[in-house]
From Swiss-Prot:
This is Protein FixC. InterPro entries: FAD-bd, FAD/NAD-bd_sf, FixC-like. The keyword Flavoprotein applies. The gene is fixC. Keywords: Electron transport, FAD, Flavoprotein, Oxidoreductase, Transport. SUPFAM superfamilies: FAD-linked reductases, C-terminal domain (SSF54373), FAD/NAD(P)-binding domain (SSF51905). PANTHER family: ELECTRON TRANSFER FLAVOPROTEIN-QUINONE OXIDOREDUCTASE YDIS-RELATED (PTHR43624), PROTEIN FIXC (PTHR43624:SF1).
Amino acid sequence: MSEDIFDAIIVGAGLAGSVAALVLAREGAQVLVIERGNSAGAKNVTGGRLYAHSLEHIIPGFADSAPVERLITHEKLAFMTEKSAMTMDYCNGDETSPSQRSYSVLRSKFDAWLMEQAEEAGAQLITGIRVDNLVQRDGKVVGVEADGDVIEAKTVLLADGVNSILAEKLGMAKRVKPTDVAVGVKELIELPKSVIEDRFQLQGNQGAACLFAGSPTDGLMGGGFLYTNENTLSLGLVCGLHHLHDAKKSVPQMLEDFKQHPAVAPLIAGGKLVEYSAHVVPEAGINMLPELVGDGVLIAGDAAGMCMNLGFTIRGMDLAIAAGEAAAKTVLSAMKSDDFSKQKLAEYRQHLESGPLRDMRMYQKLPAFLDNPRMFSGNPELAVGVARDLFTIDGSAPELMRKKILRHGKKVGFINLIKDGMKGVTVL
């Protein structure tokens, strides 16, 4: 057993863990971060978009020194059928404040940089070690068991990712259900910087974020994504795990077909595959939230299910960062009173209520709303069908626009459209 007792041991050097370590170390706390990967970020996978507001609050102007890829200024939302797509395009040319910006990032580089900031502030990092168990004494978590050694701490922060076995062992989290998560796959495709900028109409460090619904997941709940990096593209898709037993294709085949789609293939043509990754993604929002606080222990980030898929935006990294800061503030308060009980650490939830939990609660009904086959089959077909008729002239007698829309609407069912519309209004 180590003779040192840390103020906090953090399991996982992802965004939540690294931020918590940074905020704690800045205030002189003795912090140990244990990461099972060979480096911070080595095991972390994301589509690739970081909303800056939560980290800007902690490290003002971080983008000037952090390895961010591109500033997102172009947004694309596409409804896709097997061979066609109807795309909405938004370009933000206005001046934005640092907290309003978002960036494409590669986690292996970005997480390593963030952990370096924590180490420079005084945090300690151990890599390549897995935490096997939490050490409890009189019902209170007092440390961890890792690689046969017991290391003690006044508090332990579990930031070990979705499906946290440690949280489950404590009884603070239930076993993850298929309806709570999705399977994500991603390819990193290398292209010259100039080619990326030409294809996506970008200038300088501008970047594009593209989301696709419909055929990428073969009409099942989920969607495709594409983010521009400096000289690579992050391309992938996410599909609800509970829908995969109904899938006619494997997830790798979905990705291959997505890459061959006429709306996607020209964007990645000539690219070189440099990385492939897969990950389980929390999807149920606040509905899969574990018990966040115990005696001597807190849970943050993906381990706490902190992810929001709104269809038009996908958030996870900014929530993890905010949770890491909230956890650190809670531990610092507990250190002042030398009280690490569940009752004292409940301040953590109060901090979260002004950020991640507030946002997650607002959209808590959205996962159920999106888990509707019409969202990913009938509605994309409706959008593409109407667009096709609007832009096709074949010499036959013209048809009023409302009749075109009505004709395609019948295929989905007007009652269904009304029901979905009314439900969407209440959810959004």
